[in-house]
Amino acid sequence: FGSFTEGLALPSMETILRQRFGMEVVSPSVRVSKNGQHLEIDVLAYTNGQLNTAYIVEVKSHAREESITQLKSILQRFRRFFPEHKDKKLYGILAAVDLSPELREKILQEGFYVARIHDQVFELDIPDNFQPRPY
């Protein structure tokens, strides 16, 4: 079911990543293995140059507290797997079909963007004054 949700999220998340955040490269389903360690990223987006930023999107059908921990772990391990991106600002986005208001608040407090599905399209669901936390 996970890849169905990821497939559902990709078109609208790609639009958000390119139009709102200026990402040039958007890669779904990135899997990396190094020295016996593995990292799986639902969507990796980045741009070089002046922005020099990367976004990692974790897609969930039903977001839970563990979803926050999982996204944090991916962000913390990212530079070991992608040393070529070590100087980029790095942000996380949790995209979910089902998400409680309480969990949404926790995700925002962690400095992650929240994306939710609305009319079969994922949209960012963040307050106007939201400040993302770089990792």
Name each model-derived stretch.
Residues 54, 87-91:
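Residue-level recognition of the N-termini of beta-strands and the immediately preceding loop/turn
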Residues 90-135:
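Domain-level recognition of nuclease-like catalytic cores that cleave nucleotide substrates
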